């Protein structure tokens, strides 16, 4: 299966205040073109990126007022795929529940499903064909989505779902020489790669001592998080220091050639920001 990251959706309480926060982190693109934004026309959203690729902030509504839809109180990933009908058939054979929709103009097919650890996964197919020249990593901007980290209580079961039902392929974690204190055993940390530099989907077993052992104020193994790659991490850290926003400077510890930091946004969503060094 061909796939790429379309966007990450992050739940927020106040859209405008959150827009200001993320503008500080990655910058807001005032000249966005329209395409995939229409998938979310019934939700209150603010998009960072271009054509719906990149980042979407959304304001959740009360769950009891929802019908024929599902929302997440955690950040979740939207993937652009090339064979949604095949995935749909496999899910039906396994009697796995999902929500399937077509856009009004028939341009997009959309499917929401929960993997075994109940992370929400949104799959989208463009009926005019799969193209990867524009994606959540490469939008012609100074930032991109490096990966989405998913917490799983059974990593192998989650990987089986992604590989056997969605058609993705598991890779091998690439660790730096000065690796931090965490496990890269495939039963505790696995990767569905889009590149040879750990870009893609990360699936991790929650580790309550992760932050403590690595001297972090944050624990990136719990609750999942998106990771954004930017051009100037030191400049961002100076801004965070000025605003007195707490962050954990992990340096290069998990992925070769990537300086990573962790922080919470103004809605207590975990984030990773990194820079290739």
Where do the language-model regions lie?
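Structured core of small recognition/catalytic domains
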Residues: 156, 163-253
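Vicinal oxygen chelate
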Residues: 1, 4-13, 33, 44-53, 65-142, 150, ...
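Hydrophobic side chains in well-ordered alpha-helices
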Residues: 18-21, 87-91, 158-161, 236-240
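A short, acidic/glycine-rich surface segment
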Residues: 41, 62-67, 129-135, 178-181, ...
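Short hydrophobic-acidic sequence motifs that mark active-site Asp/Glu residues
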Residues: 54-56, 120, 200-202, 270-272
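Core segments of cupin and vicinal oxygen chelate
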Residues: 1-2, 9-55, 151-200
